[in-house]
């Protein structure tokens, strides 16, 4: 059990830190939602690669469950979308939904293709 908790925890700490740093790196002139969009797109792309290339169970725990689970954020996406709706910005809310969903699906597919190619 501990042999699973350690890699999971390390990955989660690294993923949360990466998301925080990514949000800090987004220029203030962009929407606050941009950092989470980039985090979700990055996670979608990497999960495709890792799903095809990582076989060891503890590395999967570290990279997929821990790191990518903390890097990506459905709750942040949900809050941003609802906030846009509450601010009477339905077009921005719909754009946010589309960009997160379509972008993540496309990047996961691309990551799977790349992961298969390098396997």
Swiss-Prot record:
Keyword terms: Cell inner membrane, Cell membrane, Ion channel, Ion transport, Membrane, Metal-binding, Sodium, Transmembrane, Transmembrane helix, Transport
Cellular component, GO, one term: plasma membrane
InterPro entries reported for this sequence: FluC
Keyword Ion transport tagged: yes
Chain segments annotated as transmembrane: 5-25, 30-50, 59-79, 92-112
Pfam families the UniProt entry points to: CRCB (PF02537)
Catalysed reactions, semicolon-separated: fluoride(in) = fluoride(out)
Binding site for Na(+): 69, 72
Entry GO MF terms: fluoride channel activity; metal ion binding
Activity regulation annotation text: Na(+) is not transported, but it plays an essential structural role and its presence is essential for fluoride channel function.
Major localization listed first in the record, in broad terms: membrane
NCBIfam families: PRK14230.1
HAMAP family, per database record: FluC
Function in brief: Fluoride-specific ion channel. Important for reducing fluoride concentration in the cell, thus reducing its toxicity.
Stated name of the protein: Fluoride-specific ion channel FluC
Organism: Neisseria meningitidis serogroup A / serotype 4A (strain DSM 15465 / Z2491)
Species lineage: Bacteria, Pseudomonadati, Pseudomonadota, Betaproteobacteria, Neisseriales
Gene, per the UniProt record: fluC
């Amino acid at each position: 059990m501990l042999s699973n908790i350690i890699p999971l925890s390390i990955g989660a700490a690294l993923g949360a830190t990466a998301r925080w740093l990514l949000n800090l790196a987004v220029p203030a002139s962009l929407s606050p939602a941009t950092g989470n969009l980039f985090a979700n797109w990055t996670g979608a792309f990497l999960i495709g690669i890792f799903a095809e290339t990582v076989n060891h169970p503890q590395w999967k725990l570290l990279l997929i469950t821990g790191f990518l689970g903390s890097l990506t954020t459905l709750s942040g996406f949900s809050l941003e979308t609802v906030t846009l709706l509450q601010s009477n910005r339905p077009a921005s809310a719909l754009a946010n939904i589309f960009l997160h969903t379509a972008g993540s699906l496309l990047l996961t597919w691309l990551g799977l293709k790349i992961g298969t190619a390098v396997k």
